[in-house]
Protein backbone atom coordinates (compact mmCIF):
# COMPACT_ATOMS: atom_id res chain seq x y z
CA UNK A 1 0.00 0.00 0.00
CA UNK A 2 1.78 3.16 -1.22
CA UNK A 3 0.50 6.63 -0.35
CA UNK A 4 1.44 9.73 -2.31
CA UNK A 5 1.61 13.29 -1.00
CA UNK A 6 -1.81 14.19 -2.45
CA UNK A 7 -3.43 11.63 -0.16
CA UNK A 8 -2.20 13.54 2.89
CA UNK A 9 -4.06 16.74 1.95
CA UNK A 10 -6.56 17.66 4.67
CA UNK A 11 -6.83 21.46 4.33
CA UNK A 12 -8.64 23.47 1.66
CA UNK A 13 -5.51 25.54 1.06
CA UNK A 14 -3.72 22.40 -0.17
CA UNK A 15 -6.25 21.97 -2.98
CA UNK A 16 -6.06 25.45 -4.48
CA UNK A 17 -9.08 27.43 -5.67
CA UNK A 18 -10.38 25.14 -8.42
CA UNK A 19 -12.08 22.26 -6.59
CA UNK A 20 -13.91 20.76 -9.56
CA UNK A 21 -13.59 16.99 -9.18
CA UNK A 22 -12.25 17.29 -5.63
CA UNK A 23 -15.18 18.79 -3.71
CA UNK A 24 -17.77 16.26 -2.63
CA UNK A 25 -21.23 17.82 -2.47
CA UNK A 26 -22.16 17.80 1.23
CA UNK A 27 -25.46 16.08 2.06
CA UNK A 28 -26.92 19.32 3.43
CA UNK A 29 -26.12 21.34 0.29
CA UNK A 30 -29.67 21.71 -0.97
CA UNK A 31 -30.86 22.94 2.43
CA UNK A 32 -28.47 25.85 2.39
CA UNK A 33 -30.46 27.59 -0.34
CA UNK A 34 -27.36 29.57 -1.14
CA UNK A 35 -28.18 29.62 -4.81
CA UNK A 36 -31.66 31.07 -4.32
CA UNK A 37 -31.41 33.65 -1.52
CA UNK A 38 -30.35 37.26 -1.98
CA UNK A 39 -29.95 37.73 1.75
CA UNK A 40 -26.37 37.61 3.10
CA UNK A 41 -25.24 34.50 4.92
CA UNK A 42 -23.14 34.27 8.06
CA UNK A 43 -21.54 30.83 7.92
CA UNK A 44 -20.28 29.48 11.23
CA UNK A 45 -18.42 26.28 11.88
CA UNK A 46 -15.76 24.73 14.04
CA UNK A 47 -12.31 23.92 12.76
CA UNK A 48 -12.34 21.26 10.08
CA UNK A 49 -16.03 21.48 9.22
CA UNK A 50 -15.37 22.44 5.60
CA UNK A 51 -16.11 26.19 5.61
CA UNK A 52 -13.33 27.12 3.21
CA UNK A 53 -13.95 24.17 0.88
CA UNK A 54 -17.63 25.14 0.65
CA UNK A 55 -16.84 28.78 -0.14
CA UNK A 56 -14.25 27.90 -2.78
CA UNK A 57 -16.65 25.47 -4.40
CA UNK A 58 -19.26 28.23 -4.71
CA UNK A 59 -16.80 30.66 -6.30
CA UNK A 60 -15.91 31.28 -9.92
CA UNK A 61 -12.62 29.34 -9.99
CA UNK A 62 -14.56 26.11 -9.41
CA UNK A 63 -17.89 26.92 -11.07
CA UNK A 64 -16.10 27.97 -14.27
CA UNK A 65 -13.27 25.47 -13.97
CA UNK A 66 -11.31 24.47 -17.06
CA UNK A 67 -12.16 20.89 -16.09
CA UNK A 68 -15.89 21.58 -16.30
CA UNK A 69 -17.23 20.65 -19.71
CA UNK A 70 -20.82 21.82 -19.55
CA UNK A 71 -22.33 25.18 -18.55
CA UNK A 72 -25.95 26.25 -18.35
CA UNK A 73 -27.41 29.72 -18.12
CA UNK A 74 -28.19 28.99 -14.46
CA UNK A 75 -24.45 28.97 -13.76
CA UNK A 76 -24.39 32.68 -14.55
CA UNK A 77 -27.18 33.70 -12.19
CA UNK A 78 -24.85 33.87 -9.19
CA UNK A 79 -21.08 34.18 -9.39
CA UNK A 80 -19.03 33.73 -6.26
CA UNK A 81 -15.98 35.80 -5.31
CA UNK A 82 -13.72 34.29 -2.64
CA UNK A 83 -11.81 36.67 -0.38
CA UNK A 84 -9.61 35.29 2.37
CA UNK A 85 -8.17 38.11 4.41
CA UNK A 86 -4.41 38.65 4.49
CA UNK A 87 -4.49 39.03 8.26
CA UNK A 88 -1.00 40.41 8.80
CA UNK A 89 -1.42 42.97 6.04
CA UNK A 90 -4.90 43.99 7.20
CA UNK A 91 -3.60 44.61 10.72
CA UNK A 92 -1.16 47.19 9.36
CA UNK A 93 -4.15 49.41 8.56
CA UNK A 94 -4.61 50.88 12.02
CA UNK A 95 -3.04 53.49 14.31
CA UNK A 96 0.49 54.50 13.17
CA UNK A 97 -0.23 58.13 13.99
CA UNK A 98 -3.44 58.35 11.99
CA UNK A 99 -7.10 58.32 12.97
CA UNK A 100 -9.55 55.64 11.86
CA UNK A 101 -10.80 57.67 8.90
CA UNK A 102 -7.69 57.08 6.78
CA UNK A 103 -7.50 53.36 7.54
CA UNK A 104 -11.24 52.83 7.00
CA UNK A 105 -10.91 54.20 3.47
CA UNK A 106 -7.69 52.24 2.94
CA UNK A 107 -9.38 48.98 3.94
CA UNK A 108 -12.38 49.70 1.70
CA UNK A 109 -9.97 50.37 -1.16
CA UNK A 110 -8.24 47.05 -0.53
CA UNK A 111 -11.57 45.23 -0.65
CA UNK A 112 -12.62 47.00 -3.84
CA UNK A 113 -9.32 46.15 -5.57
CA UNK A 114 -9.53 42.47 -4.59
CA UNK A 115 -13.19 42.11 -5.59
CA UNK A 116 -12.59 43.96 -8.88
CA UNK A 117 -9.61 41.76 -9.70
CA UNK A 118 -11.59 38.57 -9.06
CA UNK A 119 -14.56 39.72 -11.17
CA UNK A 120 -12.24 40.59 -14.07
CA UNK A 121 -10.36 37.28 -13.83
CA UNK A 122 -13.71 35.49 -13.84
CA UNK A 123 -14.70 37.29 -17.07
CA UNK A 124 -11.38 36.40 -18.68
CA UNK A 125 -11.64 32.73 -17.74
CA UNK A 126 -15.17 32.50 -19.12
CA UNK A 127 -14.08 34.30 -22.29
CA UNK A 128 -11.21 31.85 -22.80
CA UNK A 129 -13.18 28.74 -21.78
CA UNK A 130 -15.15 26.21 -23.80
CA UNK A 131 -18.26 28.33 -23.28
CA UNK A 132 -17.86 30.40 -26.45
CA UNK A 133 -21.41 31.70 -26.86
CA UNK A 134 -20.57 35.15 -25.52
CA UNK A 135 -16.82 35.22 -26.13
CA UNK A 136 -17.15 38.04 -28.68
CA UNK A 137 -19.06 40.27 -26.25
CA UNK A 138 -16.39 39.65 -23.61
CA UNK A 139 -13.64 40.43 -26.12
CA UNK A 140 -15.32 43.72 -27.03
CA UNK A 141 -16.28 44.90 -23.53
CA UNK A 142 -14.68 48.21 -22.51
CA UNK A 143 -14.42 49.97 -19.16
CA UNK A 144 -13.88 53.56 -20.17
CA UNK A 145 -16.94 54.75 -18.19
CA UNK A 146 -14.99 53.97 -14.99
CA UNK A 147 -12.64 56.82 -15.87
CA UNK A 148 -14.99 59.13 -13.98
CA UNK A 149 -13.39 57.57 -10.90
CA UNK A 150 -9.88 56.88 -12.25
CA UNK A 151 -8.84 58.50 -15.52
CA UNK A 152 -6.03 55.99 -16.11
CA UNK A 153 -8.21 52.89 -16.37
CA UNK A 154 -7.52 51.08 -19.68
CA UNK A 155 -10.26 49.98 -22.04
CA UNK A 156 -9.59 46.28 -22.61
CA UNK A 157 -10.23 43.44 -20.18
CA UNK A 158 -6.67 42.08 -20.24
CA UNK A 159 -5.12 45.50 -19.72
CA UNK A 160 -7.61 46.28 -16.94
CA UNK A 161 -6.60 43.10 -15.07
CA UNK A 162 -2.93 44.10 -15.26
CA UNK A 163 -3.78 47.63 -14.16
CA UNK A 164 -5.72 46.49 -11.07
CA UNK A 165 -2.96 44.03 -10.22
CA UNK A 166 -0.38 46.82 -10.31
CA UNK A 167 -2.68 49.11 -8.31
CA UNK A 168 -2.90 46.51 -5.58
CA UNK A 169 0.87 46.02 -5.48
CA UNK A 170 1.40 49.77 -5.16
CA UNK A 171 -1.25 49.93 -2.45
CA UNK A 172 0.52 47.18 -0.50
CA UNK A 173 3.79 49.07 -0.86
CA UNK A 174 2.19 52.26 0.46
CA UNK A 175 0.64 50.53 3.49
CA UNK A 176 3.85 48.70 4.33
CA UNK A 177 5.96 51.86 4.01
CA UNK A 178 3.37 54.35 5.16
CA UNK A 179 5.74 56.59 7.12
CA UNK A 180 8.11 56.93 4.14
CA UNK A 181 5.56 57.65 1.39
CA UNK A 182 3.78 60.95 1.95
CA UNK A 183 1.02 60.80 -0.67
CA UNK A 184 -1.38 57.90 -0.54
CA UNK A 185 -2.80 56.38 -3.75
CA UNK A 186 -6.33 57.02 -4.96
CA UNK A 187 -8.76 55.09 -2.77
CA UNK A 188 -11.59 53.44 -4.68
CA UNK A 189 -15.01 53.53 -2.97
CA UNK A 190 -17.36 50.54 -3.05
CA UNK A 191 -19.37 52.22 -5.79
CA UNK A 192 -16.46 51.38 -8.12
CA UNK A 193 -17.46 47.69 -7.94
CA UNK A 194 -21.11 48.56 -8.42
CA UNK A 195 -20.27 50.58 -11.56
CA UNK A 196 -18.15 47.70 -12.86
CA UNK A 197 -21.03 45.27 -12.40
CA UNK A 198 -23.35 47.70 -14.19
CA UNK A 199 -20.99 47.76 -17.19
CA UNK A 200 -20.97 43.96 -17.28
CA UNK A 201 -24.77 43.77 -17.05
CA UNK A 202 -25.20 46.20 -19.94
CA UNK A 203 -22.59 44.77 -22.29
CA UNK A 204 -22.72 40.98 -21.95
CA UNK A 205 -26.16 39.45 -22.35
CA UNK A 206 -25.44 36.29 -20.34
CA UNK A 207 -24.57 38.50 -17.33
CA UNK A 208 -27.57 40.81 -17.52
CA UNK A 209 -29.13 39.33 -14.35
CA UNK A 210 -26.00 38.09 -12.58
CA UNK A 211 -25.61 38.62 -8.84
CA UNK A 212 -22.04 38.69 -7.58
CA UNK A 213 -21.69 37.07 -4.15
CA UNK A 214 -18.58 37.91 -2.17
CA UNK A 215 -17.59 35.26 0.39
CA UNK A 216 -15.24 36.66 3.02
CA UNK A 217 -13.40 33.90 4.88
CA UNK A 218 -11.93 34.03 8.41
CA UNK A 219 -13.90 37.11 9.46
CA UNK A 220 -12.78 36.46 13.06
CA UNK A 221 -9.24 37.62 12.25
CA UNK A 222 -10.26 41.20 11.46
CA UNK A 223 -9.75 44.06 13.89
CA UNK A 224 -12.94 45.73 15.26
CA UNK A 225 -13.01 48.67 12.82
CA UNK A 226 -12.65 46.36 9.84
CA UNK A 227 -15.46 44.16 11.13
CA UNK A 228 -17.67 47.26 11.23
CA UNK A 229 -16.88 47.92 7.57
CA UNK A 230 -17.84 44.37 6.58
CA UNK A 231 -20.96 44.60 8.76
CA UNK A 232 -21.93 47.78 6.91
CA UNK A 233 -21.60 45.98 3.58
CA UNK A 234 -23.72 43.10 4.91
CA UNK A 235 -26.36 45.53 6.23
CA UNK A 236 -26.72 47.20 2.85
CA UNK A 237 -26.25 44.14 0.62
CA UNK A 238 -28.65 43.79 -2.26
CA UNK A 239 -28.55 42.30 -5.72
CA UNK A 240 -26.35 42.49 -7.73
CA UNK A 241 -23.71 42.62 -4.95
CA UNK A 242 -24.14 40.44 -1.84
CA UNK A 243 -21.58 40.12 0.96
CA UNK A 244 -21.33 36.93 3.00
CA UNK A 245 -18.92 35.96 5.77
CA UNK A 246 -17.55 32.70 7.19
CA UNK A 247 -16.03 32.33 10.63
CA UNK A 248 -15.47 30.12 13.63
CA UNK A 249 -18.09 29.94 16.37
CA UNK A 250 -18.37 32.87 18.81
CA UNK A 251 -16.68 35.23 16.34
CA UNK A 252 -19.54 37.63 15.60
CA UNK A 253 -18.52 39.65 18.63
CA UNK A 254 -19.13 43.03 16.97
CA UNK A 255 -22.46 43.79 15.34
CA UNK A 256 -22.03 47.55 14.89
CA UNK A 257 -21.72 49.13 11.46
CA UNK A 258 -19.94 52.36 10.52
CA UNK A 259 -23.23 54.14 11.18
CA UNK A 260 -25.53 53.90 14.16
CA UNK A 261 -27.11 50.63 13.04
CA UNK A 262 -26.30 47.04 13.90
CA UNK A 263 -26.64 43.88 11.85
CA UNK A 264 -29.47 41.69 13.09
CA UNK A 265 -30.04 38.01 12.37
CA UNK A 266 -32.93 37.18 10.00
CA UNK A 267 -33.50 40.87 9.24
CA UNK A 268 -30.04 41.45 7.74
CA UNK A 269 -28.63 37.95 7.30
CA UNK A 270 -29.30 34.28 7.77
CA UNK A 271 -26.98 32.17 9.90
CA UNK A 272 -25.71 28.77 8.79
CA UNK A 273 -24.10 26.52 11.40
CA UNK A 274 -22.13 23.88 9.52
CA UNK A 275 -21.75 21.75 12.65
CA UNK A 276 -25.53 21.49 12.90
CA UNK A 277 -25.85 20.91 9.16
CA UNK A 278 -23.41 17.99 9.44
CA UNK A 279 -25.19 16.52 12.44
CA UNK A 280 -26.34 13.03 11.52
CA UNK A 281 -24.38 13.04 8.25
CA UNK A 282 -20.76 13.26 9.38
CA UNK A 283 -20.02 9.53 9.50
CA UNK A 284 -21.02 8.87 5.89
CA UNK A 285 -19.79 12.20 4.49
CA UNK A 286 -16.33 11.84 6.06
CA UNK A 287 -16.21 8.25 4.79
CA UNK A 288 -16.98 9.41 1.25
CA UNK A 289 -14.14 11.94 1.39
CA UNK A 290 -11.67 9.27 2.51
CA UNK A 291 -12.91 6.70 0.00
CA UNK A 292 -12.48 9.22 -2.83
CA UNK A 293 -8.83 9.62 -1.80
CA UNK A 294 -8.40 5.83 -1.70
CA UNK A 295 -10.13 5.50 -5.06
CA UNK A 296 -7.71 7.96 -6.67
CA UNK A 297 -4.56 6.74 -4.92
CA UNK A 298 -4.85 3.08 -3.91
CA UNK A 299 -7.86 1.17 -5.22
CA UNK A 300 -9.73 2.56 -8.23
CA UNK A 301 -12.58 0.09 -7.76
CA UNK A 302 -13.53 0.94 -4.18
CA UNK A 303 -16.19 3.50 -5.21
CA UNK A 304 -18.85 2.09 -7.50
CA UNK A 305 -20.76 5.39 -7.83
CA UNK A 306 -17.99 7.98 -7.78
CA UNK A 307 -19.92 10.40 -10.03
CA UNK A 308 -22.66 10.70 -7.39
CA UNK A 309 -20.26 12.55 -5.09
CA UNK A 310 -20.10 15.57 -7.42
CA UNK A 311 -23.74 15.70 -8.50
CA UNK A 312 -26.22 17.77 -6.49
CA UNK A 313 -29.10 15.76 -7.94
CA UNK A 314 -27.56 12.54 -6.52
CA UNK A 315 -27.84 13.63 -2.87
CA UNK A 316 -31.06 11.65 -2.49
CA UNK A 317 -29.35 8.52 -3.82
CA UNK A 318 -26.52 8.98 -1.32
CA UNK A 319 -29.06 9.23 1.51
CA UNK A 320 -30.38 5.75 0.74
CA UNK A 321 -29.79 3.44 3.71
CA UNK A 322 -28.28 0.69 1.55
CA UNK A 323 -25.74 3.10 0.07
CA UNK A 324 -24.78 4.44 3.51
CA UNK A 325 -24.40 0.94 4.96
CA UNK A 326 -22.16 -0.04 2.05
CA UNK A 327 -19.94 3.03 2.54
CA UNK A 328 -19.62 2.52 6.30
CA UNK A 329 -18.85 -1.19 5.96
CA UNK A 330 -15.92 -0.42 3.66
CA UNK A 331 -14.39 1.78 6.36
CA UNK A 332 -15.10 -0.74 9.12
CA UNK A 333 -13.18 -3.32 7.11
CA UNK A 334 -10.32 -0.88 6.54
CA UNK A 335 -10.11 0.11 10.22
CA UNK A 336 -11.23 -2.91 12.31
CA UNK A 337 -11.81 -2.68 16.05
CA UNK A 338 -12.23 -4.80 19.18
CA UNK A 339 -15.26 -4.43 21.43
CA UNK A 340 -14.65 -3.74 25.15
CA UNK A 341 -15.61 -7.34 25.97
CA UNK A 342 -13.20 -8.67 23.34
CA UNK A 343 -10.48 -6.43 24.74
CA UNK A 344 -11.20 -7.77 28.24
CA UNK A 345 -10.71 -11.29 26.91
CA UNK A 346 -7.41 -10.28 25.31
CA UNK A 347 -6.29 -8.71 28.59
CA UNK A 348 -6.61 -11.99 30.48
CA UNK A 349 -4.61 -13.74 27.76
CA UNK A 350 -1.81 -11.16 28.06
CA UNK A 351 0.53 -12.43 30.79
CA UNK A 352 1.67 -8.99 31.92
CA UNK A 353 -1.79 -7.42 32.08
CA UNK A 354 -3.39 -10.54 33.54
CA UNK A 355 -0.77 -10.68 36.30
CA UNK A 356 -1.54 -7.07 37.21
CA UNK A 357 -5.30 -7.73 37.34
CA UNK A 358 -4.95 -10.70 39.70
CA UNK A 359 -2.33 -8.95 41.80
CA UNK A 360 -4.70 -6.02 42.43
CA UNK A 361 -7.60 -8.35 43.28
CA UNK A 362 -5.42 -10.35 45.67
CA UNK A 363 -4.34 -7.21 47.52
CA UNK A 364 -7.94 -6.01 47.76
CA UNK A 365 -9.07 -9.26 49.38
CA UNK A 366 -6.11 -9.27 51.75
CA UNK A 367 -6.72 -5.66 52.82
CA UNK A 368 -10.34 -6.47 53.61
CA UNK A 369 -9.54 -9.73 55.44
CA UNK A 370 -11.96 -11.40 53.07
CA UNK A 371 -13.30 -14.87 53.73
CA UNK A 372 -13.59 -15.28 50.00
CA UNK A 373 -10.21 -16.07 48.45
CA UNK A 374 -8.82 -15.18 45.07
CA UNK A 375 -8.98 -18.87 44.18
CA UNK A 376 -12.71 -18.82 44.88
CA UNK A 377 -13.11 -16.06 42.29
CA UNK A 378 -10.86 -17.80 39.78
CA UNK A 379 -12.64 -21.13 40.16
CA UNK A 380 -15.87 -19.54 38.93
CA UNK A 381 -14.29 -19.23 35.49
CA UNK A 382 -16.40 -16.10 34.95
CA UNK A 383 -16.35 -13.99 31.81
CA UNK A 384 -13.21 -11.84 31.33
CA UNK A 385 -15.13 -8.54 31.55
CA UNK A 386 -16.29 -9.44 35.05
CA UNK A 387 -12.72 -10.01 36.22
CA UNK A 388 -11.54 -6.77 34.60
CA UNK A 389 -13.93 -4.67 36.72
CA UNK A 390 -13.50 -6.73 39.90
CA UNK A 391 -10.67 -4.59 41.34
CA UNK A 392 -12.79 -1.42 40.98
CA UNK A 393 -15.69 -3.05 42.84
CA UNK A 394 -13.42 -4.31 45.62
CA UNK A 395 -12.03 -0.79 46.11
CA UNK A 396 -15.46 0.40 47.21
CA UNK A 397 -17.14 0.14 50.61
CA UNK A 398 -18.74 -3.27 50.60
CA UNK A 399 -18.44 -6.93 51.59
CA UNK A 400 -16.46 -9.07 49.10
CA UNK A 401 -18.88 -11.93 49.76
CA UNK A 402 -21.71 -9.90 48.22
CA UNK A 403 -19.66 -9.36 45.07
CA UNK A 404 -18.77 -13.04 44.94
CA UNK A 405 -22.43 -14.01 45.23
CA UNK A 406 -23.37 -11.63 42.40
CA UNK A 407 -20.57 -13.07 40.25
CA UNK A 408 -21.89 -16.58 40.87
CA UNK A 409 -25.29 -15.44 39.58
CA UNK A 410 -23.70 -13.76 36.55
CA UNK A 411 -21.67 -16.88 35.74
CA UNK A 412 -24.85 -18.94 35.91
CA UNK A 413 -26.60 -16.47 33.57
CA UNK A 414 -28.99 -15.42 36.32
CA UNK A 415 -30.16 -11.89 37.07
CA UNK A 416 -27.12 -10.15 38.57
CA UNK A 417 -25.86 -6.67 39.42
CA UNK A 418 -22.80 -7.51 37.31
CA UNK A 419 -24.82 -6.73 34.19
CA UNK A 420 -25.05 -3.03 35.15
CA UNK A 421 -21.60 -2.96 36.75
CA UNK A 422 -19.98 -4.16 33.53
CA UNK A 423 -22.01 -1.72 31.44
CA UNK A 424 -21.05 1.23 33.66
CA UNK A 425 -17.44 0.40 34.51
CA UNK A 426 -15.81 -1.75 31.85
CA UNK A 427 -14.42 0.99 29.59
CA UNK A 428 -13.11 3.02 32.53
CA UNK A 429 -11.43 -0.06 34.03
CA UNK A 430 -9.84 -1.01 30.70
CA UNK A 431 -8.36 2.48 30.37
CA UNK A 432 -7.08 2.43 33.96
CA UNK A 433 -5.42 -0.97 33.64
CA UNK A 434 -3.75 -0.10 30.35
CA UNK A 435 -2.52 3.11 31.95
CA UNK A 436 -0.98 1.20 34.87
CA UNK A 437 0.78 -1.26 32.59
CA UNK A 438 1.96 1.42 30.09
CA UNK A 439 0.53 -0.55 27.19
CA UNK A 440 -1.14 0.71 24.04
CA UNK A 441 -4.89 0.62 24.56
CA UNK A 442 -6.89 -0.98 21.70
CA UNK A 443 -9.99 1.02 22.66
CA UNK A 444 -8.51 3.77 20.45
CA UNK A 445 -8.94 1.80 17.23
CA UNK A 446 -11.63 1.25 14.67
CA UNK A 447 -13.65 3.36 12.27
CA UNK A 448 -16.44 4.10 14.76
CA UNK A 449 -13.84 5.27 17.28
CA UNK A 450 -12.24 7.55 14.68
CA UNK A 451 -15.66 9.14 14.09
CA UNK A 452 -16.10 9.83 17.81
CA UNK A 453 -12.55 11.13 18.20
CA UNK A 454 -12.97 13.49 15.23
CA UNK A 455 -16.30 14.87 16.52
CA UNK A 456 -17.52 16.32 13.22
CA UNK A 457 -14.03 17.60 12.32
CA UNK A 458 -13.31 16.29 8.83
CA UNK A 459 -9.66 17.33 9.04
CA UNK A 460 -9.13 15.34 12.25
CA UNK A 461 -10.89 12.30 10.78
CA UNK A 462 -8.73 12.35 7.66
CA UNK A 463 -5.57 12.79 9.72
CA UNK A 464 -6.45 9.79 11.89
CA UNK A 465 -7.07 7.68 8.80
CA UNK A 466 -4.05 8.85 6.82
CA UNK A 467 -1.64 8.44 9.74
CA UNK A 468 -2.99 4.94 10.40
CA UNK A 469 -2.52 3.99 6.75
CA UNK A 470 0.98 5.49 6.77
CA UNK A 471 1.86 3.62 9.97
CA UNK A 472 0.63 0.40 8.39
CA UNK A 473 2.70 1.12 5.30
CA UNK A 474 5.82 1.44 7.46
CA UNK A 475 5.01 -1.64 9.52
CA UNK A 476 6.05 -5.22 8.94
CA UNK A 477 2.40 -6.14 9.45
CA UNK A 478 0.64 -5.15 6.24
CA UNK A 479 -2.65 -6.15 4.71
CA UNK A 480 -3.98 -4.20 1.76
CA UNK A 481 -6.97 -2.12 2.80
CA UNK A 482 -6.97 -3.38 6.38
CA UNK A 483 -4.97 -1.57 9.05
CA UNK A 484 -3.99 -3.74 11.99
CA UNK A 485 -5.25 -2.53 15.40
CA UNK A 486 -1.81 -1.95 16.90
CA UNK A 487 -0.83 0.29 13.99
CA UNK A 488 -4.06 2.24 14.43
CA UNK A 489 -3.38 2.79 18.13
CA UNK A 490 0.17 4.02 17.46
CA UNK A 491 -1.14 6.42 14.83
CA UNK A 492 -3.99 7.69 17.00
CA UNK A 493 -1.62 8.50 19.88
CA UNK A 494 0.65 10.45 17.51
CA UNK A 495 -2.25 12.38 15.98
CA UNK A 496 -3.66 13.17 19.41
CA UNK A 497 -0.34 14.59 20.57
CA UNK A 498 0.07 16.62 17.37
CA UNK A 499 -3.45 18.06 17.65
CA UNK A 500 -2.92 18.96 21.31
CA UNK A 501 0.34 20.77 20.64
CA UNK A 502 -1.25 22.49 17.64
CA UNK A 503 -3.36 24.44 20.15
CA UNK A 504 -0.32 26.65 20.71
CA UNK A 505 -0.91 28.06 17.22
CA UNK A 506 -4.54 29.01 17.87
CA UNK A 507 -4.43 32.79 17.64
CA UNK A 508 -2.66 35.14 19.99
CA UNK A 509 -4.04 33.28 23.03
CA UNK A 510 -2.73 29.93 21.75
CA UNK A 511 -0.15 29.27 24.46
CA UNK A 512 -2.69 29.98 27.18
CA UNK A 513 -5.31 27.76 25.52
CA UNK A 514 -2.73 24.97 25.29
CA UNK A 515 -2.00 25.26 29.00
CA UNK A 516 -5.71 25.09 29.86
CA UNK A 517 -6.20 22.04 27.61
CA UNK A 518 -3.30 20.36 29.43
CA UNK A 519 -4.83 21.19 32.81
CA UNK A 520 -8.30 19.94 31.90
CA UNK A 521 -6.85 16.76 30.44
CA UNK A 522 -4.75 16.24 33.56
CA UNK A 523 -7.83 16.62 35.79
CA UNK A 524 -9.69 14.03 33.73
CA UNK A 525 -6.66 11.76 33.70
CA UNK A 526 -6.53 12.00 37.49
CA UNK A 527 -10.18 10.92 37.66
CA UNK A 528 -9.45 7.99 35.33
CA UNK A 529 -6.69 6.79 37.71
CA UNK A 530 -9.18 6.36 40.56
CA UNK A 531 -9.10 2.59 41.09
CA UNK A 532 -12.65 2.53 42.44
CA UNK A 533 -13.94 4.07 39.19
CA UNK A 534 -16.58 5.79 41.29
CA UNK A 535 -17.27 8.18 38.41
CA UNK A 536 -15.84 6.48 35.30
CA UNK A 537 -15.35 8.25 31.98
CA UNK A 538 -15.52 11.85 33.17
CA UNK A 539 -14.79 13.86 30.04
CA UNK A 540 -17.08 16.86 30.34
CA UNK A 541 -17.93 19.42 32.98
CA UNK A 542 -20.31 22.15 34.04
CA UNK A 543 -19.55 25.44 35.77
CA UNK A 544 -21.66 26.74 38.63
CA UNK A 545 -21.94 30.48 39.14
CA UNK A 546 -21.28 33.36 36.77
CA UNK A 547 -17.84 33.85 35.26
CA UNK A 548 -16.03 37.17 35.39
CA UNK A 549 -15.24 38.96 32.14
CA UNK A 550 -11.65 37.73 31.87
CA UNK A 551 -12.54 34.07 32.41
CA UNK A 552 -15.53 34.35 30.07
CA UNK A 553 -13.26 35.67 27.32
CA UNK A 554 -10.97 32.65 27.72
CA UNK A 555 -13.93 30.25 27.69
CA UNK A 556 -15.16 31.80 24.44
CA UNK A 557 -11.69 31.39 22.92
CA UNK A 558 -11.66 27.72 23.93
CA UNK A 559 -15.04 27.29 22.23
CA UNK A 560 -14.08 29.32 19.16
CA UNK A 561 -11.03 27.14 18.51
CA UNK A 562 -12.92 23.90 19.33
CA UNK A 563 -10.69 23.04 22.27
CA UNK A 564 -14.02 22.68 24.08
CA UNK A 565 -17.50 21.88 22.78
CA UNK A 566 -20.60 23.34 24.40
CA UNK A 567 -23.97 21.63 24.72
CA UNK A 568 -27.09 22.25 26.76
CA UNK A 569 -26.80 20.93 30.29
CA UNK A 570 -28.36 17.54 30.78
CA UNK A 571 -30.65 17.02 33.75
CA UNK A 572 -28.91 17.92 36.99
CA UNK A 573 -30.72 17.60 40.30
CA UNK A 574 -34.07 18.16 38.56
CA UNK A 575 -32.77 21.37 36.96
CA UNK A 576 -32.58 21.52 33.16
CA UNK A 577 -30.77 24.67 32.11
CA UNK A 578 -27.27 25.99 31.53
CA UNK A 579 -24.37 24.55 29.55
CA UNK A 580 -21.80 21.81 29.84
CA UNK A 581 -18.44 21.59 28.13
CA UNK A 582 -16.57 18.64 26.65
CA UNK A 583 -12.84 18.54 26.07
CA UNK A 584 -12.23 17.86 22.38
CA UNK A 585 -12.16 14.03 22.11
CA UNK A 586 -9.15 14.17 19.78
CA UNK A 587 -7.04 14.87 22.88
CA UNK A 588 -8.33 11.76 24.71
CA UNK A 589 -5.66 9.28 23.55
CA UNK A 590 -2.91 11.61 24.77
CA UNK A 591 -4.32 11.55 28.31
CA UNK A 592 -5.63 7.96 28.01
CA UNK A 593 -9.13 9.08 28.92
CA UNK A 594 -12.45 8.13 27.41
CA UNK A 595 -13.58 9.78 24.17
CA UNK A 596 -17.22 9.10 25.07
CA UNK A 597 -19.42 11.75 26.69
CA UNK A 598 -20.58 9.79 29.73
CA UNK A 599 -20.16 11.45 33.12
CA UNK A 600 -19.77 15.06 34.10
CA UNK A 601 -17.58 16.71 36.70
CA UNK A 602 -18.55 20.05 38.21
CA UNK A 603 -16.40 23.12 38.77
CA UNK A 604 -17.36 26.26 40.62
CA UNK A 605 -16.73 29.52 38.82
CA UNK A 606 -13.73 30.10 41.12
CA UNK A 607 -12.29 26.67 40.34
CA UNK A 608 -12.65 27.20 36.60
CA UNK A 609 -10.98 30.59 36.90
CA UNK A 610 -8.10 28.90 38.74
CA UNK A 611 -7.80 26.32 35.95
CA UNK A 612 -7.64 29.12 33.38
CA UNK A 613 -5.62 31.76 35.21
CA UNK A 614 -4.07 30.21 38.33
CA UNK A 615 -0.30 29.73 38.63
CA UNK A 616 1.36 26.31 38.82
CA UNK A 617 1.39 26.18 42.62
CA UNK A 618 -2.32 27.03 42.82
CA UNK A 619 -3.19 24.43 40.20
CA UNK A 620 -1.10 21.70 41.85
CA UNK A 621 -2.78 22.42 45.20
CA UNK A 622 -6.15 22.21 43.44
CA UNK A 623 -5.22 18.79 42.01
CA UNK A 624 -4.10 17.50 45.40
CA UNK A 625 -7.34 18.65 47.03
CA UNK A 626 -9.42 16.96 44.32
CA UNK A 627 -7.47 13.73 44.74
CA UNK A 628 -7.94 13.83 48.52
CA UNK A 629 -11.66 14.53 48.07
CA UNK A 630 -12.02 11.65 45.58
CA UNK A 631 -10.24 9.25 47.95
CA UNK A 632 -12.64 10.15 50.76
CA UNK A 633 -15.60 9.63 48.44
CA UNK A 634 -14.21 6.25 47.37
CA UNK A 635 -13.90 5.10 50.98
CA UNK A 636 -17.54 6.02 51.57
CA UNK A 637 -18.84 4.58 48.29
CA UNK A 638 -21.13 1.59 48.35
CA UNK A 639 -22.02 -0.38 45.27
CA UNK A 640 -25.42 -1.33 46.64
Predicted segments, located by residue:
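Long, compositionally biased intrinsically disordered regions
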Residues: 533-640
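Conserved P-loop NTPase mechanochemical-coupling segment
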Residues: 133-192
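Short amphipathic alpha-helical interface segments
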Residues: 503-539
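The catalytic "switch" region of P-loop NTPases
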Residues: 192-210, 222-447, 483-513
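Walker B catalytic acidic pair
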Residues: 217-221
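Walker A/P-loop-proximal flanking segment of P-loop NTPase domains
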Residues: 1-84, 93-97, 101, 105
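The conserved phosphate-sensing helix
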Residues: 454-465
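P-loop NTPase motor core
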Residues: 74-144, 272-290
Amino acid sequence: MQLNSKFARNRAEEYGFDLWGDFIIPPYFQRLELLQSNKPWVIEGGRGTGKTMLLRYLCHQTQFSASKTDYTENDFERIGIYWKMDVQFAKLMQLRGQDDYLWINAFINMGVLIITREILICLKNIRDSQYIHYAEELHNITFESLRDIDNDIPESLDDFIKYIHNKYKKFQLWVSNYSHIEEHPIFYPLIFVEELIDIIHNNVDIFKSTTFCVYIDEYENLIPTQKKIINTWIKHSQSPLIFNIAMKHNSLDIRETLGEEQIVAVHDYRAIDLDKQLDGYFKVFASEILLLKICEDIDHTILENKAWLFDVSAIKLRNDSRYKTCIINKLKKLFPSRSPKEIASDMLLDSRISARIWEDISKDLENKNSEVTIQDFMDLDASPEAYVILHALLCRKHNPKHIYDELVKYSNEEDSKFIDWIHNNLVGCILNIYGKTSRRCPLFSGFETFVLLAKDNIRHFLELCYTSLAQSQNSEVQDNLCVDIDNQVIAVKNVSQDMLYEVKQFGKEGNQLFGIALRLGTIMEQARKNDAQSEPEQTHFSISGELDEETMFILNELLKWSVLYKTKLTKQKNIEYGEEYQLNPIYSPYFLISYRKKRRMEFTNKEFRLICLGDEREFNDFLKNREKHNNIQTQQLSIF
